[in-house]
Amino acid sequence: MDNNKTKEGKTTHIFERPIAITDVETTGLDFAIQEIVEIGLVIINQKTLEIIDTLDVKVKPEHIKTANEFALKVNGYNETDWKNAITLKEAMSIYGEKTKDAIFCAHNVTFDWSFIFEAFRKTGIKNQMDHHRIDLFTMIWMKLRNSSFEKFNLNEVAKRLGVPEEPMPHRAINGTMTAYKIYKK
């Protein structure tokens, strides 16, 4: 596929494509075993940094027995709050449509992308995103590499940049909004 063409054949230069800032909450760290339980998404205009669209969706886990208890504590998962959660296939269908031709961005791109990629594969939903990835961690590292950090997580970076910290429990849309505010810096 031509790098400057959308899936419909429209010409869109890479610097004109939207950015899909994504955060996933999962039942653990291993994308091959654990599952997505929440997806947060902020689509922004790359030039203006204005928000175009958002997504905040809880996903019903199919194999909660494989969950890591610490992960569930961090993201606040509980059966009551997830009573009306949708299936992974439904969530990825919505996510896939919203992110069409967008460039994937995350604070920890390897982690979030591995779960999103696996979810596209598992559900059979076609990934129509641009093949490039933006790693917010790397962008921040370049800006703050001469600073001293005990931890280099999203909240520590937010504090350094004057962005409000993400509230706990860690929710996907809150992580995404914090990442968006950091991206704008």
Language model features: what each stretch is:
Residues 113, 136, 173-176:
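Conserved glycosyltransferase catalytic-site signature
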Residues 119-123, 142-145, 160, 182-185:
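Active-site catalytic microenvironments for nucleophilic, acid-base chemistry
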Residues 112-132:
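Substrate-recognition/cap helix-loop segment adjacent to the acidic, metal-dependent catalytic center
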Residues 171-184:
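Acidic, divalent-metal-coordinating active-site segment for phosphoryl/phosphodiester hydrolysis
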Residues 150-154:
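Juxtamembrane/interfacial segments flanking transmembrane helices
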Residues 29-31, 141, 181:
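Conserved protein kinase catalytic core
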Residues 133-149:
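Short alpha-helix plus adjacent loop in nuclease-associated cores
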Residues 2-117, 155-170:
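Conserved non-catalytic scaffold segment of RNase H-like nuclease domains
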